[in-house]
C-alpha cells in the first residue's frame, strides 16, 4: 500500500521549508505519507490541484500567490477561512469534495504563547493590511486584547480591513504617521524585512518589556527585529509561526498533533 501524498503549492516554491517540516512531523508521529513542493502555473491553480488529486493526492498547503485561488476553489470552507478570505490548507474529503481551512492565525497565536507572550489585555499593533494580516485577526481577537490596531502605508486599506474584521469597532486602523502611544506587542505582517526595509516607526512605539514579532524569518535577525532590540524590545521571528501553522494543517489531515518544539529546534539549526 503506497504512502498518502501531500504537497505545498506555490510559485515560486523551491525555497519552501514545508517538505522538511512535514517529513519531521511524519517521522515523529509514525505517519506513512510523502510531502513535496509543487510549482503550480500562476494562471491555473485549480488545474494543478485537480491533477494532484487525480494522481492520489490527499491534501495540500497553499502559499503565495494561490491562497485566494484556493479559497474560490473550495467546496466547503471553515468559518475561519471564510472570515479570512483565503486558505492555506486543502483536504480531499472521502466524499470527493475539497475542504479548505486557514491555519496561519492559529500558528501565530500558538507561537506567541509558546514564547510566553500574554495576549489577553495587551495593546497589539499589526503592521500591514494584506492577506497575511487579514488571516490572523480573528485568532488574535479571540484572545481578548485591550486594543488591536492596524497600521499601513495606505491608511485607507488599514481602516477598511479594520472595519471588515470588526464592525463593532474592536479593531482600528490608520497610517504610520498617525501612530501614537506604546504597544505591548507589535507584529510585522509586511514583507518589508525580505528587502531589508523598515516601516517608518516612531521610537516610542514599543512599551517597556514590549514584544516585536516579525512574520518573516532568516538566519540573522531581520531589520525589524534589529529595530526592536535597539529600542529595548524582545524580538521573535516567524519561524515558529511557520511550524505551528504546519502542525495545525498536519492535524487536519492526519488527526494527530505533532510536538513542535523539537522541530523548531531542528529548523533553527538548519537556517
From Swiss-Prot:
Keyword Amino-acid biosynthesis part of the UniProt annotation: yes
Keywords assigned by UniProt, alphabetized: Amino-acid biosynthesis, Aromatic amino acid biosynthesis, NADP, Oxidoreductase
Q: Where is the active site?
A: 67 (proton acceptor)
- In the record, what terms sit under GO molecular function? NADP binding; shikimate 3-dehydrogenase (NADP+) activity
Reaction(s) catalysed by this chain, per the record, are: shikimate + NADP(+) = 3-dehydroshikimate + NADPH + H(+)
List the GO terms this entry assigns under cellular component, sorted alphabetically. Answer: cytosol
Catalytic EC class: oxidoreductase
Taxonomically, which superkingdom?
Answer: Bacteria
> Looking at the keywords, is Transmembrane present?
no
Q: Give the quaternary structure.
A: Homodimer.
The protein in question is named Shikimate dehydrogenase (NADP(+))
- Annotated source species: Chromohalobacter salexigens (strain ATCC BAA-138 / DSM 3043 / CIP 106854 / NCIMB 13768 / 1H11)
